[in-house]
């Protein structure tokens, strides 16, 4: 008898859960649309050489050219390391092989410092655009953020992922701008 009562209770609970209204659909009727855009993660094809002083703090950049399944673990082997320790600069310039429309996803492996670390991202349709500063009169200041952000700074979480950007690009430059830090 006790088992029958328990079964009846479970069935009543299941019916109550199944019968609940979708509050998002009800509250957004007539002012929402389904997104049919698909998402695809693309691995860069090659590294573009940068002057030596800009890459002094870069170890194992080839790891960025390998497919990544998106799963970070505390033992993720063979990662790229960017370090600004001892006053070094840490920059990489990636070539995706063809112009894409979208943004980038950054994944950070485990590290000693658990705070979010700042990186500067520059998206460009050419190497010179990805290397240039936005606006100004400097010789390397030929790009703009007018139609979409292509030069921005963001924080990369500890043992986590972040996605940003919405632009047309083929090349992506990533600079670790956090002083005295290491990003894996």
Language-model features: where?
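Extracellular/oxidizing-compartment recognition motifs
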Residues: 20-184
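Cleavable N-terminal signal peptides
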Residues: 6-7, 17
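Positively charged n-region of N-terminal signal peptides that target proteins for export
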Residues: 1-5
